[in-house]
Amino acid sequence: ARDPFEFIWIDEGAADMAAYLCFGVTNTLTGHANAWSQNSNMSVRWWNQRIADYGAGFLFMMYLSDKLGGASSISTLVANTDTGGSAIEDLASNAPPGSTPIGTTMSDIFANFTLAVSIDSDQGAFGFSNLDLSTGCISAFICKAQMSGFNDQWVNPWTSPLQELEGWGVRAYKFNQGSGAPLNIMAQPSEFGFEGALL
């Protein structure tokens, strides 16, 4: 291996990406990707050998490849002896001309990935051009991160019950049909000492 000490989530994400490049979307890949998309509160970076862990790594590696130069960017990442987020930050900081800016810190890169996997927009960093993500999770298609909750009725205050979230995981909510009044959001953590972002 060119980088024998790389973190497993990157190795397995690259392995699933190689399978995609060789065989296209298979039942195994949709199973991996959709397991995470349906449970995106699971960490992209913490490896617990769950099916969703493979899918998280695959989607993140596909995002990096799409935005930072394709196969050559993944070759650069694999050859980099730094591991994990450090190698990814190096790649993003030294992206080839024509790459889509996605940030240069893991926090910024992950925030842009979060938007891309949640909405799959055609705009810059906020979608995938190398995958066609479907709204619903069905076996033949790779789906977007599924909403953790939604609200389209504004008669009463809306709350979401306890939502667990691992570090480097995602929770996505949809709000629509509001009055145009400011939206106030309050999150109450059960653990302290962690950073998070509302996008």
Model-identified regions with their sequence ranges:
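Active-site-proximal alpha-helical
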Residues: 37-119
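Short, isolated positions within intrinsically disordered regulatory regions of eukaryotic proteins
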Residues: 13, 40, 50-51, 158, ...
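Acidic, low-complexity intrinsically disordered regions
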Residues: 5, 32, 42-43, 150, ...
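A residue-identity detector for tryptophan
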Residues: 9, 36, 46-47, 154, ...
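Zinc-dependent metallopeptidase catalytic helix centered on the HExxH motif
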Residues: 1-37
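Beta/coil-rich, acidic/histidine-enriched accessory regions frequently appended to metallopeptidases
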Residues: 83-199
